[in-house]
Structure formats: structure tokens, C-alpha cells
Amino acid sequence: FLMGVHQGHATVRNNQFDKALHDNHTVATVLREAGYKTALIGKYGLQGKGQDAESWEAYPTKRGFDEFFGYVAHRDGHVHYPSHPWPIGNSESHRTGKQVWWNEREVSSELTRCYTTDLFTARSKQWIIDHRGTAPEQPFFLYLAFDTPHAALQVPTCAYPEGQGLNGGVRWLGRSGKMINTATGTIDSYRHPDYI
């Protein structure tokens, strides 16, 4: 999808996790050249070798995205609470904390009790609100790549807040330790009343 070619012609083969996405056109570069504002929020896993946004050869902002917020490494997207280790994980990479990047800054230490589905939803909603406030006439492309359900099969901390749309439900607060309005309670604990 990102390269705009049939999967039989794609350069990422055989689940080669974290292989660098070739320096070629992506849907984001094409749309950005056409005047769109672009963002990728969620799980990426196509960065190549390196340790940070500057050294990763194919970091999302180097492949056509104006903004990136999410997991860069494939393995990090297996756990849904980035600042909390998953103690029953079946590998060391599952049991340790994960890295979430916001453009060129690693922010996982600010994400206490943030469940990634809520986090990526809230960040996406806020990105749309911000874009509408700064450039309402400019078209946009938002690629939202959730990491759930996957490996850890963790659940949220609480029931979803009332309301809907950009100003209701899950919302971005943007404060360290309280990035989203559902970052409360005990991690991996919410059970819907119908299933108790």
C-alpha cells in the first residue's frame, strides 16, 4: 500500500521486519507533492538499521510524512502499554518497555497508562483538529496503523468516555503522564459489564 504497487511487486518480502523502505515514491510523497498535509500515526516497522530518527534511513518523515507518532520498530508494536513492561511476555523484547516516537523525539516515558489504541486514536483526532485550525483548505492524508489486537492481547484501563466525534470520547490532553483522557486506572484491567 505505501509504495502503490501490488504486493507481488513490493520490495518488503517474507516478513522482513524493520527492513528499510526503499527511497522511492510512497503514497505519502505523492500526496505531499500534490499539496496534502501527511501524517502516519501508529505502527511503522520499515525504518531500517539505526537507533533514532536521525540514523534510521527510512524514518517516516524521510518517506513523505510531515508528522509521525507511534512505534518505529516492529517488535514494539506487540505490547499495548508502551511505558509498562509486559511481565508475562515470551521474550525479553516483550518484557521491556517500548519506544514511541513523536517526530524526532522518543516520548514513551510520558505515556503512563496509555493504551495504544486509545493513544493513536486520540493523537489522530488531535492532528485533524490542529490541521483544521491551521490550514482548513489544505487536503490531508492520515495513515492510522493500529497495533491491536496483537501478541499481548491487552485491554484498556477503563470504559470509553461518553461522546463522539472530535470533541467527545477518547481525547488527546498532551500532558506528560496524562497524554490522553483514558490514561487512568489499572493497566490491562477493563472488562465490559456484559462479560463479567
Show where each model-derived region lies:
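Formylglycine-dependent sulfatase
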Residues: 1-196
